[in-house]
C-alpha cells in the first residue's frame, strides 16, 4: 500500500530545546493513526511537520505527490460579536463554491446547521462544521487535532462513528491527535504515544471485552471506543527528559 506521508527519524528543535527526537510514522490510505501524549509532548509540532508547516532539522519526509489534506484544528476562536453563520464561515475557505456547502454539511449530519450562528454551536456541532470544512478539500488525508476535546462520551461515540464512515467512503488516511491518554477510537489501526520521542506504539484494546464499560455506555459506545494500554520501558521528568529505563539503574 502506497504511503500518503512517511516520516523517518525526524527531529525538530526550537533554539536549544529539542521538541521531537527520531520520530518515525507512516500514514496510509484507509488507515487511522492516533497520536497521544501529555501536554507539551510535541504533538502539535508533529502535526505541523505532517502538514508541511515546520521543516525538521533532521530526518526524511516523503509525501505522495500533490497530497490533498483536510485539517480540523484543536480550537476555533471567533469574536462573539461577529455575526457569522455556518454557511458564511464555510464560504470563507478559499476556492469554496456555495453549491458544495450544504452537501458537505449533510455528509457530516449537520445540514440543519447551515444558517445557525457559529457562536451558538455546541462543541460537537462545531467539530462537525469544522469537519465539513475539511471535506471541502476532498482530502486524501484527514488531520484531526483533538477532535473530541470538550465533547462528552456520547458525542465522542457519534464523532468516531462519523470518522469511520468517512474513512471508508473516501478511503482517506486519518491522523488523529487525542488529549485522552487511554481512551481512543476503537477502530484505530495504530496508536503512537509521544513524549518528544515515540515512547510506545500498538493497537487499542476494544472496549467490548469489558462488560462494565458496555453497561455504562451501551453496545454502540463499546464498538467505537477503545482502551490503549501503554507499555513504556522508561519514564520522563517534568521537562520530558528520559530519567529511568526499566532494568537499568541509570538513565
Swiss-Prot record:
This protein's record includes keyword Transmembrane helix: no
Localization per record: Cell inner membrane
Q: Which UniProt keywords apply?
A: ATP-binding, Cell inner membrane, Cell membrane, Ion transport, Membrane, Nucleotide-binding, Translocase, Transport, Zinc, Zinc transport
State the InterPro entries in the record. AAA+_ATPase, ABC_transporter-like_ATP-bd, Metal_Ion_Import_ABC, P-loop_NTPase
- Which GO biological-process labels does this protein carry? response to zinc ion
Q: What is its EC number?
A: 7.2.2.20
Q: Which amino acids does the record list as binding ATP?
A: 37-44
SUPFAM superfamilies referenced in this protein's UniProt entry, alphabetically: P-loop containing nucleoside triphosphate hydrolases (SSF52540)
Which top-level enzyme class is recorded in the Swiss-Prot or TrEMBL entry?
translocase
User: PANTHER family from the entry?
Assistant: METAL TRANSPORT SYSTEM ATP-BINDING PROTEIN TM_0124-RELATED, ZINC IMPORT ATP-BINDING PROTEIN ZNUC
Protein name as catalogued: Zinc import ATP-binding protein ZnuC
Q: Which gene encodes it?
A: znuC
Amino acid at each position: 500500500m502506497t504511503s500518503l506521508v512517511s516520516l523517518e527519524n525526524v527531529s525538530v528543535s526550537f533554539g536549544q530545546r529539542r521538541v521531537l527526537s527520531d520520530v518515525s510514522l507512516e500514514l496510509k490510505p484507509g488507515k487511522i493513526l492516533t497520536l497521544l501524549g501529555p501536554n507539551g509532548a510535541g504533538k502539535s509540532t508533529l502535526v505541523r511537520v505532517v502538514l508541511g508547516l515546520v521543516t525538521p532539522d533532521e530526518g526524511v519526509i516523503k509525501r505522495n505527490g500533490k497530497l490533498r489534506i483536510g485539517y480540523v484544528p484543536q480550537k476555533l476562536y471567533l469574536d462573539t460579536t461577529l455575526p457569522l453563520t455556518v454557511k458564511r464561515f464555510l464560504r470563507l475557505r478559499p476556492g469554496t463554491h456555495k453549491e458544495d456547502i450544504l452537501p458537505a454539511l449533510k455528509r457530516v449530519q449537520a445540514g440543519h446547521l447551515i444558517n445557525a450562528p457559529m457562536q451558538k454551536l455546541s462543541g460537537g456541532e462545531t467539530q462537525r462544521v469544522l469537519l465539513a470544512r475539511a471535506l471541502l478539500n476532498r482530502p486524501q488525508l484527514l488531520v484531526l487535532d483533538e477532535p473530541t476535546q470538550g465533547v462528552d462520551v456520547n458525542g465522542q461515540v457519534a464523532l468516531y462513528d462519523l470518522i469511520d464512515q468517512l474513512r471508508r467512503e473516501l478511503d482517506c488516511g486519518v491522523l488523529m491527535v487525542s488529549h485522552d491518554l487511554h481512551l481512543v477510537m476503537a477502530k484505530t489501526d495504530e496508536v503512537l504515544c509521544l513524549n518528544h520521542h515515540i515512547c510506545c506504539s500498538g493497537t487499542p484494546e476494544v472496549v467490548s471485552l469489558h462488560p462494565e464499560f458496555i453497561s455504562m455506555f451501551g453496545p454502540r459506545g463499546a464498538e467505537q471506543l477503545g482502551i490503549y494500554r501503554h507499555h513504556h520501558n522508561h519514564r520522563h521528568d517534568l521537562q520530558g527528559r528520559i530519567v529511568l529505563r526499566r532494568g537499568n539503574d541509570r538513565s
